[in-house]
Amino acid sequence: MRRFARVALLFLGCGVCSLLYGVSQLALSLEQEAGGARQRQARESAAPGGGRQAGSADGGEEGAGRCKNLSVSFWNSYWMLPSDVCGVNCFWEAAFRYTYMETQPSETMHLAVVACGERLEETITMLRSAIIFSIKPLHFHIFAEDQLHESFKDILDDFPYEGKVNYTLYPITFPSEGAKEWKKLFKPCASQRLFLPLILKDVDSLLYVDTDILFLRPVDDIWSFLRKFDSTQIAAMAPEHEEPRIGWYNRFARHPYYGVTGINSGVMLMNMTRIRRKYFKNDMTSVRLRWAEILMPLLKKYKLNITWGDQDLLNIMFFHNPESLYVFPCQWNYRPDHCIYGSNCKEAEEEGIFILHGNRGVYHDDKQPTFRAVYEAIKNYSFGDDLVRSLLQPLELELQKTVHTYCGRVYEVFIKQLKKSIKDLSVRRSKGS
């Protein structure tokens, strides 16, 4: 019995000693923190501006960079972060917890397009449609073959919106590994879009569109979806089909795809900062891979099974990472498939088409005259002319000639939003904004 009592006393003594040691260390850390705070305050009061932002800890650039770096190698065990890492209380907190880690859409809207071959006129028409109704400044990132650069420059320099619109021309470039395969994937240069997060390293958010896109409402409105992303979402696209019975992926695909009918990448809104940071789940390795690491392995594994090139690769990625995709309604990427088999985009029927996507070359043949009429109307519109007399009224007359087609039977959806956009623009101009 005495032996047990001695053991109990020994444990009790050890416990008391541990408690005293913990209290002394806590008191010491509080004293050091108070002293450090006084020293920092003295330094900051002597510096211009006097204050500092969260994340600019005393560790200088190294400390600030360490605080913002998402690699787990920067954080010690149990997420107990050293006091010199962050300019906030990081105790028991993870790197993702603080708002300064979140990126906010910038005031300027960034729009990217890739143009190869005979796509100059189509691209210019798309850019014109983006300019007509948009409110915030636009910066166009145009990736084009070298022989197209001079033509783009001559046309864009004549646009009458100096100050509101800027542009940058880029050559078509692919990674040295597999450059030939990337260039010929699906259509010439189409896969360039996959490398935009790696090329435009200083651009936080970006709207990528195909050349055959027409904006029927301000770019600002689709840009605002960035603020609707939850903490896991990195991109937004529309479904490939609304009706599974006419879907391509669910009937013919030989690879994984997102959701029920897949996604269409002709209109792709991206938070590129998040894309560059994310580690993607995949079916090639148990290790998650970053964007730059996953593209080539995906192509090597699936190149014999994909039909639509880079769009198929994006479907595979988001099949494994569905939580990272925001899906917007079909009216933001309205294609011939939404009307040639009968109207199957309810949102467009109710509110009109927001973004028209004339894939399959429908702007340049007579197979879908409804789509071609919208394209020709915007192409022929002169900046500064009255939008009702020079754009809307001629377009409505042309659309009425297409009622013999399935899409022409619902031609009202092609001008419903356009009418509203013109009215809203007129109100803004009357208010001087």
Swiss-Prot record:
Cellular component terms per the entry's GO annotation: membrane
Annotated gene: GXYLT1
Query: Which UniProt keywords are listed?
Result: Glycoprotein, Glycosyltransferase, Membrane, Signal-anchor, Transferase, Transmembrane, Transmembrane helix
Biological source species? Gallus gallus (Chicken)
The organism's superkingdom is given as: Eukaryota
TM annotation in the entry: 7-29
What is the protein name given in its UniProt record?
Glucoside xylosyltransferase 1
Q: Which residues lie on this side of the membrane: Cytoplasmic?
A: 1-6
Q: Which residues lie on this side of the membrane: Lumenal?
A: 30-433
Q: What is the lineage of its organism?
A: Eukaryota, Metazoa, Chordata, Craniata, Vertebrata
Molecular-function GO terms, alphabetical: UDP-D-xylose:beta-D-glucoside alpha-1,3-D-xylosyltransferase activity; UDP-xylosyltransferase activity
Q: Which CDD domains match?
A: GT8_like_2 (cd06430)
